[in-house]
């Protein structure tokens, strides 16, 4: 049989397994690929292939992540699985592997554990929109009352962290039985994928979001005006549309009078394009790197926010010492550094290298931001942390 060419006819969704160490995340990932491979929806990938996750660098941070892909009747999935707890924390905070949804794996024999809680909290903080639960290792539990108790605990925990605990599908099964080819194991995997297909919402495509482009460079072209360059982050910009210049200074309105890519003139630029945009009546000194061009009214500048942050360990090239309240590093948003002051919660004296923490920040200049925006923390040009805006405070 000739090899089928990969055609993107199905909608694409990014997903990942989360949960406590040894509850069976990697076994489940392997089981999904092996079961879906039977219908040609995946390449069967063994446990040890996934477990030997390659290291990747994202914003100066080394993260081990395994990627597999598979498809159901309805969708194409890219699935990420991490070997260690620290990799999950880093992955979710840096957004190295964007998650449109998650499969929370909980061992029925152990119930929710500390990392179960931490992963649910992180998923909430970084804006993972939905999750489905796989109650694993049910073959090790003889008592149906105990299973029911664990399910109740999981639902309560999800509700506590702001997920709809009563609605979330919980599938009971055994990844090991699925890997061994037992019918009840296989049935549970198929049930799980049906739940993922129907419960995890289709992500909004970047082109359907409001236009936004971080400014990387500004040029003056004699006789034509000011051109700003950058990579369109979301949406579409058409010639003749009104746009706003947001961040660092007062918001200004202008009009796009030209879009250029690879020295060719276009009618529009869309997310992912590296473009130059000609601005009507805007002077060279009125725009700078670090601002953004955006659809009017779609984004506002802010200087106070709360964040979930991973602080690099000394081994990762981070700080050698903890930092305390009023620490003033640089916050790198999109294309620029802005100095800010960190305010720790009253019950936290210091943050150690290698920790993840929640704290508030006040920047010296406002930046165009929305919840979910990622940033790096830098000190003297080196990255010492990575974070995500969880709440805007002004």
UniProtKB/Swiss-Prot annotation:
<dbReference type="Pfam" id="PF00009">
    <property type="entry name" value="GTP_EFTU"/>
</dbReference>
<keyword id="KW-0479">Metal-binding</keyword>
<dbReference type="InterPro" id="IPR009001">
    <property type="entry name" value="Transl_elong_EF1A/Init_IF2_C"/>
</dbReference>
<feature type="binding site">
    <location>
        <begin position="81"/>
        <end position="85"/>
    </location>
    <ligand>
        <name>GTP</name>
    </ligand>
</feature>
<keyword id="KW-0342">GTP-binding</keyword>
<comment type="similarity">
    <text>Belongs to the TRAFAC class translation factor GTPase superfamily. Classic translation factor GTPase family. EF-Tu/EF-1A subfamily.</text>
</comment>
<dbReference type="InterPro" id="IPR005225">
    <property type="entry name" value="Small_GTP-bd"/>
</dbReference>
<dbReference type="InterPro" id="IPR027417">
    <property type="entry name" value="P-loop_NTPase"/>
</dbReference>
<dbReference type="InterPro" id="IPR004160">
    <property type="entry name" value="Transl_elong_EFTu/EF1A_C"/>
</dbReference>
<feature type="binding site">
    <location>
        <begin position="19"/>
        <end position="26"/>
    </location>
    <ligand>
        <name>GTP</name>
    </ligand>
</feature>
<dbReference type="InterPro" id="IPR031157">
    <property type="entry name" value="G_TR_CS"/>
</dbReference>
<dbReference type="InterPro" id="IPR000795">
    <property type="entry name" value="T_Tr_GTP-bd_dom"/>
</dbReference>
<keyword id="KW-0963">Cytoplasm</keyword>
<feature type="region of interest" description="G2">
    <location>
        <begin position="60"/>
        <end position="64"/>
    </location>
</feature>
<dbReference type="InterPro" id="IPR041709">
    <property type="entry name" value="EF-Tu_GTP-bd"/>
</dbReference>
<dbReference type="InterPro" id="IPR004161">
    <property type="entry name" value="EFTu-like_2"/>
</dbReference>
<protein>
    <recommendedName>
        <fullName>Elongation factor Tu</fullName>
        <ecNumber>3.6.5.3</ecNumber>
    </recommendedName>
</protein>
<feature type="region of interest" description="G4">
    <location>
        <begin position="136"/>
        <end position="139"/>
    </location>
</feature>
<dbReference type="Pfam" id="PF03143">
    <property type="entry name" value="GTP_EFTU_D3"/>
</dbReference>
<feature type="binding site">
    <location>
        <position position="26"/>
    </location>
    <ligand>
        <name>Mg(2+)</name>
    </ligand>
</feature>
<feature type="region of interest" description="G3">
    <location>
        <begin position="81"/>
        <end position="84"/>
    </location>
</feature>
<dbReference type="GO" id="GO:0003746">
    <property type="term" value="F:translation elongation factor activity"/>
</dbReference>
<dbReference type="InterPro" id="IPR004541">
    <property type="entry name" value="Transl_elong_EFTu/EF1A_bac/org"/>
</dbReference>
<keyword id="KW-0378">Hydrolase</keyword>
<dbReference type="GO" id="GO:0003924">
    <property type="term" value="F:GTPase activity"/>
</dbReference>
<dbReference type="InterPro" id="IPR009000">
    <property type="entry name" value="Transl_B-barrel_sf"/>
</dbReference>
<keyword id="KW-0648">Protein biosynthesis</keyword>
<feature type="region of interest" description="G1">
    <location>
        <begin position="19"/>
        <end position="26"/>
    </location>
</feature>
<dbReference type="GO" id="GO:0005737">
    <property type="term" value="C:cytoplasm"/>
</dbReference>
<dbReference type="Pfam" id="PF03144">
    <property type="entry name" value="GTP_EFTU_D2"/>
</dbReference>
<comment type="function">
    <text>GTP hydrolase that promotes the GTP-dependent binding of aminoacyl-tRNA to the A-site of ribosomes during protein biosynthesis.</text>
</comment>
<comment type="subunit">
    <text>Monomer.</text>
</comment>
<keyword id="KW-0460">Magnesium</keyword>
<dbReference type="InterPro" id="IPR050055">
    <property type="entry name" value="EF-Tu_GTPase"/>
</dbReference>
<dbReference type="InterPro" id="IPR033720">
    <property type="entry name" value="EFTU_2"/>
</dbReference>
<feature type="domain" description="tr-type G">
    <location>
        <begin position="10"/>
        <end position="204"/>
    </location>
</feature>
<feature type="binding site">
    <location>
        <begin position="136"/>
        <end position="139"/>
    </location>
    <ligand>
        <name>GTP</name>
    </ligand>
</feature>
<dbReference type="GO" id="GO:0097216">
    <property type="term" value="F:guanosine tetraphosphate binding"/>
</dbReference>
<keyword id="KW-0251">Elongation factor</keyword>
<keyword id="KW-0547">Nucleotide-binding</keyword>
<feature type="region of interest" description="G5">
    <location>
        <begin position="174"/>
        <end position="176"/>
    </location>
</feature>
<dbReference type="GO" id="GO:0005525">
    <property type="term" value="F:GTP binding"/>
</dbReference>
